[in-house]
Amino acid sequence: MKKAMRSILVIIACCFVLNSAAQKTIDTIATKVDGFDIPIRIKLPKNTTGKNPVYFFVHGGGWNGGTATSVPPARLSTDANYLANQLGVIYVGLAYRCKGNNATFADAIQDLEASVQWFFENADTYNADLTRIGFGGSSAGSTLAAMMAQKYKNCKLFVGAEGMYNLVEHSEERSTFPSQKARELYGLATEKESKKASAFYNL
């Protein structure tokens, strides 16, 4: 009985190891800013040769979250497995400081730029083709991702879901996000700040 039990445990352990290896998801710290670790999550494609394109994903959440000691985690969207395993895309989840970190939109952009730069510097480790990169995001993350996409000449793709790209002409009658309170808390209270954070005005 004990021998059979040990065999079962060995099989389970092997399955876990193989599954973990197959997933090829890497979690690490890309940079440290003002005492905060900025994490990054990388989903590598399986069974590819040569260099692969890169897709940077910025999570949503209304710029909420974060504490006095940590930022919200880097996350992958539901399409990560398909893009990585079926299309050979390196899928990179980015993190950034939010309102709970007493941060601003400009701080978030700084975090994202630092994380992307870290990935660029480690591109050879992940067999990344930096001539083919794209950005995307959901909701509040899409607003940030749109700004990021405009910063890199090798960006070939932008995918935004339910983002806000013109914060200057925004009104709560059109959309409840971001609320006036959220704008004030995240450094978007003035027209100058809103214009600087609007992809529409940075084309």
Where are the regions a protein language model picked out?
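Short amphipathic alpha-helix adjacent to the substrate-entry channel of hydrolases
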Residues: 69-92
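Short beta-to-alpha linker loops that shape the active-site pocket of alpha/beta-hydrolase fold enzymes
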Residues: 61, 95-99, 164
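Bacterial Sec-dependent N-terminal signal peptides
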Residues: 1-24
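Short beta-strand element of the alpha/beta-hydrolase
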Residues: 51-62
